[in-house]
Regions:
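A short, basic N-terminal segment
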Residues: 1-94, 248-271
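A short, well-structured juxtamembrane/interface segment
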Residues: 90-112
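Short glycine-rich substrate-engagement loop in P-loop NTPases that contacts/grips substrate
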Residues: 94-101, 117, 132-172, 182-189
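Walker A/P-loop nucleotide-binding motif
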Residues: 108-128
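A general structural motif
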Residues: 109-111, 170, 202
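Structural motif
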Residues: 172-174, 206
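Walker B catalytic acidic pair
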Residues: 177-178
């Protein structure tokens, strides 16, 4: 639409918007300004268009930031689908995880982390991933990784301190599957350095592990003992029990496969 189709001149000589009726011009105070008597002003339509434009660019910037932080956060793209929207929110632990996110500012201020522990396959990593994805939406920087990856990444580096400091810089650090990494003196030294530096940074730490809490608390090996002591200093233990979700998924896939493989096969059956 042409500007002349939306603008008219009032009896006072000012231009008016035909849509909202507001003036698109205003008079300078008596005497004018540099020989000009009138200046431009935004009508309601102009203000609305400006606000919509600002919102568009702000939303675009937000989406790009979240996308960039998400790609940095996860080692595997499938983890991006681990969200509260896809979870069973009737689960008590999942509800606690959501509460952690909803109270993030207080958790961050008080340096409160979580230690999700329990049997294999009960969804500990998924729960941590849900926390990560929800905080990423809120423009919180998160890194979710494991010590095997950290040790592999740090091994060839001349400046290991820089890498460890980078891990400490994220607003939330999530270490997945504590206890499956190598038990060498070198590996345990790296693990302690990462945990210790993180705690000294004052930023929250979340850990998932299949190790029983009793075993963590009663560890006698000195190198592990000092690691676990530092973890329990910051992370509140949260038990994740129930049946193995991995076994349930595997069973469901097996039944689906049997159904598909037995389709139109006559008397041939999958056992």
């Amino acid at each position: 639409m042409r500007e002349e189709d939306t603008v008219c001149v009032g009896s006072d000589g000012l231009q008016y918007c035909k849509v909202c009726g507001e003036a698109k011009e205003a008079f300078f105070p008596e005497g004018g300004f540099m020989g000009m008597k009138k200046h431009f002003r935004q009508c309601a339509c102009d203000r609305k268009a400006y606000e919509e434009e600002q919102k568009y660019f702000k939303d675009k910037e937000h989406r790009e930031l979240v996308s960039r932080n998400t790609s940095i956060c996860f080692d595997e793209s499938r983890m991006e689908e681990w969200t509260f929207e896809n979870a069973d929110m009737s689960d008590a632990v999942m509800h606690k995880a959501k509460s952690y996110v909803d109270n993030w500012e207080e958790m961050k201020r008080n340096h409160i982390g979580c230690l999700f522990w329990g049997p294999v396959g009960t969804g500990k990593s998924y729960i941590a991933g849900c926390i990560a994805n929800e905080l990423l939406k809120r423009e919180v920087t998160v890194k979710m990784t494991n010590f095997n990856t950290i040790i592999d990444n740090i091994f060839p580096l001349a400046d290991k301190t820089e890498y460890i400091n980078a891990l400490a810089s994220y607003q939330l650090l999530i270490i997945d599957d504590l206890g499956v990494e190598r038990n060498s003196e070198y590996a345990l030294g790296i693990i302690f350095s990462v945990i210790d530096r993180r705690i000294r940074s004052g930023r929250p730490l979340i850990i998932t592990t299949n190790l029983p809490l009793k075993e963590i608390k009663s560890e006698t090996m000195l190198d592990k003992r000092r690691i676990y002591d530092r973890i329990l200093e910051m992370c509140t233990p949260v038990y994740v029990g129930g049946t193995s979700k991995r076994e349930a998924i595997a069973s469901m896939k097996m039944e689906k496969a049997k159904t598909l493989l037995n389709t139109n096969r006559g008397k041939e059956k999958c056992e």
